[in-house]
A protein has these predicted regions:
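PRPP-associated nucleotide enzymes
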Residues: 1-182
């Protein structure tokens, strides 16, 4: 088991790339099934910076026509979610009357997704769905209110880095997923 150090924290391998890439294949198949054949062109909205690697892998597998856009939101400080969500870089496309697929690296408490769904509704989107690489069901606070539509993999309520996820902006480039080694 490989161990790495980022600043003051040591991490160990949690999920190797080869184990979760099949989860991305499955989610892409679900999206292709649900969005192929429609007259409209949905928007794939990648949340920066964490979802970039997941979104890139997903986009390679999507077979329906789609538009690509980005948005930057943040709710983390170090290893903890702050509970305060901020839009740091708004999307540059018009979502009025459009369907939007929010691509997220990890859904934890759900506060970011609650803000995103509300934000997209205010901007005129007719539908928004959540597609996440990782989902922490133990910490999710909006189970009866906001559905997480496409989940690549459920994980335990532990802090992870790699494949886009970071610890103070470091570790996004790691191919595998690492967990705190405590």
């Amino acid at each position: 088991m490989e161990k790495i150090t980022i600043f003051d924290k040591t991490f160990k391998t949690y999920i190797p790339y080869d184990e979760f890439i099949g989860d991305i294949d499955r989610v892409a198949e679900e999206l292709n099934r649900d969005y192929s054949g429609g007259d409209d062109i949905p928007i794939i909205l990648c949340t920066l910076n964490g979802a970039v690697m997941f979104c890139a892998e997903l986009m390679k597998r999507i077979t329906f026509k789609c538009e690509f856009a980005t948005i930057k939101v943040s709710s983390y400080s170090g290893t903890q979610t702050t509970g305060v969500v901020q839009v740091k870089q708004p999307m540059l496309c018009d979502v009025t009357g459009r369907r939007v697929i929010i691509v997220e690296d990890i859904v934890d408490t759900g506060y970011t997704m609650k803000l995103m769904k509300s934000y997209l509704s205010e901007k005129g989107a007719v539908d928004s769905r959540i597609c996440t690489l990782f989902y922490k069901p133990e910490s999710y606070r909006f189970k009866d209110v906001i559905n997480v539509d496409y989940i690549a993999r459920e994980i335990q309520n532990q802090f992870i880095v790699g494949f886009g996820l970071d610890y103070n902006e470091i570790g996004r480039n790691l191919k595998d997923i690492y967990i705190l080694d405590e």
